[in-house]
Amino acid sequence: MNRSDLLENPRTQTESGFLLIHKPVGMTSSDLVVTVRKKLGFKKVGHTGTLDRAASGLMILPIGSCTSFSSVFLEKEKSYEAWVKPGESTDSGDKEGEILESLSKEQTETWFQEHQEKLRNLFEQVPTWETQEAPEVSALKVNGRRRSDLFREGVALVPVVRKIKIYRYELGKFSPESISFQIRVSAGTYIRKIVMDISDRIGFPLRLEKLVRTSIGKLNLNQADSYESLLDGKIKIHPPETILDFPTVEVPDTEVRNVLNGRKIKLEWIPVNEFLLVSPEEEILAWCKKEEHGIHELDYKYLRVFPKN
């Protein structure tokens, strides 16, 4: 479906599904949402978690009624490829921030020759980390305001410490010019803060030079459309059943209307936790959740019903 088809097609305003887009460096997540609205004509577009302006990579954008599923992806594991610049540090931990310290090439190489084993050991210990203090320059809100804005104004911020988990980690290039690694982490983990913390522990300036998000849950960057494809209007709308991990329960034709009217029906089986009710044509009718300790055919609740247009 190209751009002209989308703009001329009356389904554009009611289409539901997901867009997988490779966000470029220099654009905020909100900028990408605005671009999708303008270029493709969708009124209802959301996103499933921010990606820093200085980073690129996979963004999942729900459209239409699928914006109801935005929160589902917030707790998914995420994978990244990171490149670190030795010899320079910023207040944000990436190249977008204000420079705090910058060493010459000669100073960096001299320090690296003397301390590289200690630095390598710190990088290799990353998989053992279990907590992380959120960076002061972040999109997290304090009384409705971004921490980064308050930090820039000189407001003292209360540390926000989170539990994190490193599922996979591989250290790659390791030289005075660049350090690289691949990592898969729990939701809410800041890769640039990992670099900032290593820098603080060893007393040597480091910052992220490049960061690419390569996956969110089961979805990979190689499935995403390029930003150029978005600008050309040549972008794929992924149906929800190919994106969501929820089990499905088929509803007979005789009960479809009851579900769409928000009336619970008896189910032959109820999956663990959350699930979708679908029609015989595999159209999503409702998003449901099993009641805690539920054992009967009605022991579930509707999280969202998707009425037909």
Curated annotation (Swiss-Prot):
GO terms for molecular function: pseudouridine synthase activity; RNA binding; tRNA pseudouridine(55) synthase activity. Pfam families: TruB_N. The keyword Transcription does not apply. It comes from the Bacteria. The active site is at 52 (nucleophile). Its EC number is 5.4.99.25. The keyword Acyltransferase does not apply. One of its GO terms (biological process) is tRNA modification. It catalyses: uridine(55) in tRNA = pseudouridine(55) in tRNA. Keywords: Isomerase, tRNA processing. PANTHER family: PSEUDOURIDYLATE SYNTHASE TRUB1, TRNA-PSEUDOURIDINE SYNTHASE. Belongs to the pseudouridine synthase TruB family. Type 1 subfamily. Responsible for synthesis of pseudouridine from uracil-55 in the psi GC loop of transfer RNAs. This is tRNA pseudouridine synthase B. It comes from Leptospira interrogans serogroup Icterohaemorrhagiae serovar Lai (strain 56601). The lineage of its organism: Bacteria, Pseudomonadati, Spirochaetota, Spirochaetia, Leptospirales.
